[in-house]
């Protein structure tokens, strides 16, 4: 069963599964019913500027929170509608099946390289629901499930551009399916149907394909699950192995083979100067980084040649958001495990790693994330490639910090921990404290994608000892303002407790600064969203970028104090 939330929304109602919340059905249904009844009152009483003002700092995830685009491959291409102008296009799978990975369509989002806080939905680029003859595959017209894709651009001698999409079709006879378009935003049409069978395609690429066109026009493909494969492709087909060459097996050592590489999946390839950089999902060793084994990381290796040999480089991003607790022990400060997939991209001279995170309590509602990184290349044979590890934050492209005077969804939290560590048993995570609940948009979600009434995820299960954090807000925007308060919108859950607002660290012993606090009472209406006003005497004089934390305290253990909806400094 699914419930549709109406709180604070106009055209959008995110869907949250009962199984993704640590709550009783009766309690949840009462909150939902009351929240939906309150829609008219909330919308009318809310200040217009709070609801509709365009965010200058969107946060992380950088796409709207109702959209789920994991496995993102970022590319800078020319805008076909504005020649000479560049846009960043992100191609990923589409988590809309809810109870399993990905979806039966692929869509693309893009943003001007000059305005990375305004992402635009460019529409569906591919659905594979008909064969070469235009016939449905079955009587129901069911489309194929499409996993993590890649895109590459081929420009001919006359300057004509063809974009090739490798959609990672999960139907056995169509694993190697590819499609092409004259535009980066599609639509794409399948171009490698078999001449012998209208339901099959000709092609060697399999799980998680990545394709690269080198400066000399030669084409290379990469793929694999737990073992890595690569091949030089025939440029006339873009799908089959070049005659006279062979598939390279175990291009780098896999998860169960010796060495530090530990390839799992998520092949991606880039060329930076004269070096080839292979990005992939790596299965860490048990105890590595002080945490259990996980494939929730992206790593890289590099070579002087597109097919190797390769030198291991290191970790680019860790989706567990490694931090240290009050005693100095390494912890996962976000979802403890899952998968991730992405790549790196240079935009206006700055490098970023694009990846995804998990939301809810399973791996089927993933969101697009980004972090700045540093890339250094030593040119020449045997030269090194050094890529710094990105930090898991709430900033996204707001590298100077989030604007505290804009209302942000609680769902951009980058730190959510409980009184004891969350656990993972594929494909589910069990949380003993705070986590970001997943939500999905409806057909009207594009009207105002970043409007707070559309763009929100709740943070739920805020039990005693839970911590919810945001890195980072830039408090310089509050300079000169007196009596600054925090307006925090919540749904109380019928127990007494306190929310402590802190900066820099959630622990005073680790130089955390207490900004303010407020009590949540058991007699507060549990069926109504309310806004708390929290005085912040400790904020005086605070400038620059600082992490913000909500620490939950209650004498009632193992029960959630409230849901967090959104907040703004006033």
Predicted regions and their residues:
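C-terminal motif of bacterial Sec signal peptides marking the signal peptidase cleavage site
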Residues: 41-43
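Short, positively charged and aromatic/hydrophobic N-terminal segments
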Residues: 2, 7, 11-19
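Short, intrinsically disordered, low-complexity terminal segments
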Residues: 10, 30-32, 45-48
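Bacterial N-terminal signal peptides
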Residues: 31-39
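Carbohydrate-active catalytic/glycan-binding domains of CAZyme proteins
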Residues: 46-570
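Short hotspots in intrinsically disordered terminal tails
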Residues: 19-20, 567
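Bacterial N-terminal signal peptides that target proteins for export
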Residues: 21-31
């Amino acid at each position: 069963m699914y419930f549709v939330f109406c709180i604070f929304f106009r055209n959008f109602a995110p869907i949250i599964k009962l199984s993704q919340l640590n709550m009783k059905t009766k309690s949840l249904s009462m909150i939902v019913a009351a929240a939906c009844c309150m829609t008219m009152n909330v919308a009318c009483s809310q200040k217009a500027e709070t609801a509709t003002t365009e965010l200058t700092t969107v946060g992380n995830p950088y796409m709207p929170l109702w959209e789920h685009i994991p496995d993102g491959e970022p590319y800078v291409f020319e805008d076909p509608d504005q020649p000479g102008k560049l846009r960043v296009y992100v191609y990923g799978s589409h988590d809309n099946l809810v109870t399993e990975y990905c979806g039966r369509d692929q869509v693309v989002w893009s943003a001007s390289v000059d305005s990375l806080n305004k992402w635009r939905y460019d529409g569906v680029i591919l659905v594979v629901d008909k064969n070469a003859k235009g016939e449905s595959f079955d009587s129901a017209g069911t489309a194929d499930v499409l996993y993590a894709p890649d895109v590459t651009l081929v420009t001919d001698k006359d300057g004509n551009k063809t974009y090739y999409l490798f959609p990672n079709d999960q139907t056995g006879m169509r694993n190697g399916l590819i499609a092409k378009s004259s535009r980066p935003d599609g639509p794409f049409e399948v171009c490698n149907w078999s001449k012998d069978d209208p339901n099959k395609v000709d092609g060697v690429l399999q799980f998680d394909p990545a394709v690269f066109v080198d400066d000399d026009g030669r084409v290379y493909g990469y793929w694999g699950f737990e073992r890595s494969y690569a091949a030089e492709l025939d440029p006339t087909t873009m799908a089959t192995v070049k005659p006279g060459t062979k598939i390279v097996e175990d291009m780098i050592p896999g998860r169960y083979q010796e060495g530090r590489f530990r390839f799992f999946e998520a092949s991606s390839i880039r060329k930076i100067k004269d070096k080839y950089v292979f990005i992939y999902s790596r299965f860490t060793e048990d105890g590595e980084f002080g945490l259990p084994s996980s494939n929730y990381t992206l790593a890289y290796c590099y070579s002087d040649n597109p097919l190797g040999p390769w030198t291991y480089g290191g970790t680019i991003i860790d989706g567990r958001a490694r931090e240290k607790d009050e005693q100095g022990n390494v912890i996962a400060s976000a979802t403890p495990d899952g998968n991730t997939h992405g790549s790196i991209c240079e935009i206006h001279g700055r490098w970023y790693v694009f990846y995804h995170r998990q939301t809810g309590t399973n791996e089927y509602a993933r969101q697009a994330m980004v972090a700045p990184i540093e890339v250094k290349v030593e040119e020449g044979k045997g030269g090194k490639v050094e890529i710094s590890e990105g930090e898991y934050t709430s900033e996204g492209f707001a590298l100077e910090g989030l604007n505290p005077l804009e209302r942000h969804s609680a769902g951009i939290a980058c730190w959510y921990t409980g009184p004891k560590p969350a656990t993972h048993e594929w494909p589910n995570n069990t949380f003993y404290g705070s986590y970001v609940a997943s939500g999905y948009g409806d057909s009207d979600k594009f009207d105002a994608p970043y409007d707070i009434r559309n763009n929100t995820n709740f943070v739920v299960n805020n039990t005693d000892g839970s911590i919810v954090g945001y890195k980072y807000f830039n408090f310089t925007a509050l300079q000169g303002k007196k009596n600054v308060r925090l307006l925090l919108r919540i749904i109380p859950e019928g127990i007494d407790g306190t929310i402590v607002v802190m900066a820099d660290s959630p622990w005073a012993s680790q130089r955390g600064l207490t900004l303010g606090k407020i009590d949540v009472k058991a007699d507060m209406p549990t069926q109504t969203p309310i806004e708390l006003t929290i005085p912040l005497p400790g904020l005086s004089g605070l400038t620059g970028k600082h992490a913000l934390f909500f620490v939950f305290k209650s004498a009632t253990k193992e029960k959630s104090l409230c849901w967090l909806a959104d907040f703004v400094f006033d």
